[in-house]
Structure formats: C-alpha cells, structure tokens
Amino acid sequence: MAGKRRISRRRFLEGSGAAITAAAVARPLRAQQAAAPPAAPRTSIAITVNGTAHRLEVEDRWTLVEALRDHLGLTGTKIGCDRGECGACTVLLDGKPVYSCSQLAVWADGRSVQTVEGLTDDPLQRAFVEHDAPQCGYCTSGQLMSAKALLTANPQATREEARAAMAGNICRCASYNHYLAAIAAAQSSQREQSTQRRASAPSSVS
C-alpha cells in the first residue's frame, strides 16, 4: 500500500527473535531477584574462648559450633547429629557442658566457652590416650569436655556418677568402659598431684 513501509519477512523474523530472546533472558533475572533472600540479621558479640577474648559479627541464626569452627578455626569441636542428640559437639559454657549445635552463638555473648583445644595440657587427655578410650575418635572431644565438667564439679565422682554424667555422649565404637577407666585414672592423678602439693607446701610455724 502507498505510504506504508513494507516489512520484509526476514526483518520480521529477526525482530521477533530478538524480542523473544530478550524476554527469555529477563524472566530468569526477575525470578532470581524475586527469589533472593533478604540479608540475615547480624549481631556483634563478645565471647571468651579458652581464656582469649574475641569480638565476632555473627548472623543471628548461627549456632555456637558454627562460630567456633567456621569463624574461630577451632575445629576440635565436632558436628555429629547436628540436632542435640549425640554429644560430639559438647563444649563448656560458663563451666557447664552444652551441645554447641543447639546453642545460638548470640546466646554466648558475654560468656566463657571452653573447647577441647583448651585441654591441651590437661591430665585427662593423657588418661584418655593411655586407656585407649578414643577408637575412631570422632566423639572424643565431646567425651573429654563432659568428663572435664564432671571432674571439675565432682572430683570424687563414683563410677556410677561418671556413667550418668557421660550418658549424653554417644560412642558408636562402644568404648564406654575405656572412657570410664580413663576418668578414674584422671581422678587418681589429680589426688596424687594434690597430695604432692600439700607435701611440698611450706609449713606455717605459729
């Protein structure tokens, strides 16, 4: 028709293809933008770990074990079940044993944490080795921390009391008797050290 610009079939197909391509690219981009989760809230916490003070920026959803392993590099604490049942992640929080997979990092703000790395020179570790307590070793750090809490709170614990205190720590290698023997050996070592300290202390003369 006169006065009207004719569009060739080739130009029509080229234009249609470009429009379809642009729409196809735009849809995933819009979907990605819509699906992007909002940034998780973060909190600054002050925490003392094995006697060293730390300031951490943590997401409010992080667990204590995540903060220890992924952000402080303390990988001695293990993640086992990750649901507060096996005890592999046990640490001491203000001296009390807790499952660090079930504790939010923000709950530790202003508090003191001890991990297995803090027991490097503890006689309890030597007793565990001497009595072949670790087998595969995965649960050992949690077993150590529960045993440490027991001997700190009750140095004269009986075997039955030790068994009860360790009940929250699962050992898939069934090395329970070895762990109890190691605890008894550590108790004996503590008593000997206490006796030696008393013997070497200068006597007071009135």
Show which residues each predicted segment covers.
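Signature of N-terminal electron-transfer/Fe-S-associated modules in redox systems
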Residues: 2-206
